[in-house]
A protein has these predicted regions:
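Short, Lys/Arg-enriched N-terminal segments with co-localized hydrophobic residues
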Residues: 1-18
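Gly/Lys-enriched N-terminal cap/neck module of very large, oligomeric protein machines
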Residues: 20-192
Length: 192
């Protein structure tokens, strides 16, 4: 919400979408063996569907691109390369996982002159090392963290909540809840 105040009196309250995820491209990530593109519009607030259709894997993919380093949090074995599609009865395993998030940046929420921001992470089975990209340019995870810090996004953000995290958020210590709210509000960088 955008709130405009004049001499302590609310003069206008309006809803404005400042940024949204336009699409996610997944290839070789968990159950998404083939390249899959999911388009979103700015009115999407959640992902729903029957059990086993990949909702949690989409959520994991978003968190992974934004820097999640815990294989346990991604529900994937013991090695980060375990997130790579490992084959099935009818499909061979693939050698790489790549996920790209494409954000609308027409309002310049991200500190960039581009109308779209692409954030990509990929991993190769051969060396188990991740590569990161912003708008197809190689970068470090720190660069991605710096880019999203002001937006309320991040691997631990309240922007991305799984079913299991709702109860853990409610049971969290007050200081842990506060830091999540600070990240969601985009003020975490000012505490450093």
């Amino acid at each position: 919400y955008i709130l405009r105040v004049f001499f302590g009196i609310i003069i206008q309250l309006e809803w404005r979408v400042l940024m949204f995820l336009k699409r996610i491209e997944l290839q070789g990530f968990k159950s998404f063996a083939d390249k899959t593109v999911i388009q979103f519009d700015q009115d999407i607030t959640g992902i729903v569907g029957p059990n086993g259709c990949g909702k949690s894997n989409v959520n994991d993919a978003i968190r992974w691109v934004l820097g999640e380093q815990s294989v346990k949090s991604l529900r994937s074995g013991t090695n980060m390369s375990d997130i790579i599609f490992s084959g099935s009865e009818y499909r061979k395993p693939v050698n790489m996982a790549r996920v790209t998030l494409v954000f609308d940046n027409s309002t310049r929420v991200f500190d960039s002159d581009f109308d779209e921001i692409e954030i990509t992470r990929q991993i190769l089975r051969a060396n188990n090392e991740a590569s990161y990209f912003i708008n197809k340019t190689p970068c470090r995870l720190k660069d991605i963290n710096d880019l999203v810090m002001d937006t309320g996004l991040g691997k631990d953000s309240l922007s991305i909540i799984t079913q299991g995290n709702i109860s853990s958020f409610a049971d969290a210590k007050p200081e842990d809840r506060r830091s999540l709210f600070e990240e969601a509000a985009g003020v975490a960088k000012y505490k450093k």
